Amino acid sequence: MEYIPILILVISFIGLLAIGTPVAWSITISALLTMLVSIPALPAFTTVAQRIGTGLDSFALLAIPFFILSGELMNKGGIAHRLIAFAKTLVGALPGGLALINIISAMLMGAIAGSAMASASAMGSILGPEMEKEGYSKEFGAAVNITSATTGLLIPPSNVLIVYSLASGGASIAALFLAGYIPGILTGLFLMLVASFWARKKGYKVGKRSTFKNIIRTFIDAVPSLFMLVVVIGGIVTGIFTATEASAIAVLYSVVLGFIYKEITFGKLPQILLDSSATTAIVMLLIGASMSMSWAMSFENIPQDISTGLLSISDNKIIILLIINLLLLVVGIFMDMTPAVLIFTPIFLPVVIKLGLDPVHFGIIMILNLCIGLCTPPVGSVLFVGVGIANTTIEKVIKPLLPLFVVMIIALFLITYLPQLSLWLPGLFDL
């Protein structure tokens, strides 16, 4: 194994992050320094620039800006209030009712908007003050909001699953979307169990039981928002349209729904477009930079070296998957999700394929690992959003966050070692 390129890549990347260099620049500079081991400066600079551009030259990636815009439209279109109202009628009378409402609403919001940060922001700003008024500690409310927001990244439509499809060399987007449902719901149920137990232990108030009439009324109010999932996912799975075409349909549906709800006006559209453009620019820069690093690693045979190293430790699937899970949990602590998927999929996927693992199953394992990282300092973006919305500190949130982390890790290992949790639904549709 050639250690020098790996050492240069790892040390330069961690060092750049440590001194506060933006992630995209850290990735690009690390890729460049790694390539300089083998080729002269001018070709190295030229190749990195080319790879950033060609890395974005993919029809599948067109879905990302459209889904981001759709999520922004849904977020500003009053969807969060309607989902919360519906969730409240279902679980509001149970112990920890408001926490359970947060989790269910976040799962639905994340699935529809496709953004954990949007979900954490919306749920935290709406439910946070209400939870505090009912006697919940704001630290517990923030912990529930932070962890539940990430479940929507597993429940489609999910931009990061599209990114994984690209990084894996063509894993079916439809299969990935279907594979995310059971793991996402299972993780949400585990979070609900912990939240309910914690609320019962602390003696938090229980809400009033809703009438059947009220359940039906709030459901009807939420149906137009939920129906978008049926249109988008149903269209992709049945082959009526591709994920990219589905994303454009989602934008059209979101605009029409926002006007019907009277939450979006023509005057608000420019700001919505500006916000979604800014988010898209960040995501696309990260994708381009990550593609340059992936190419640099392939050029230096780093994935093959790591694959050989892992398989030399053991050829036991259980042990190798345990090692990969631990590595991905560490990666999630220090790296944003999109670059992590693009950089580490080419490294670990060949290993798990040799062990007989399905690429779709591994995609769900990887995303759930990185979802846990989004809730973890030092770069957990959802953690910072949730703490900021709740007006508290990371140190105070850690205690209520720990039991939620534990059940997320339990869910991770169940999903890792019980592949049918991910593969049953795709198999049902012959995907």
What name fits each language-model region?
Residues 1-431:
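Alpha-helical transmembrane segments of multi-pass membrane transport proteins
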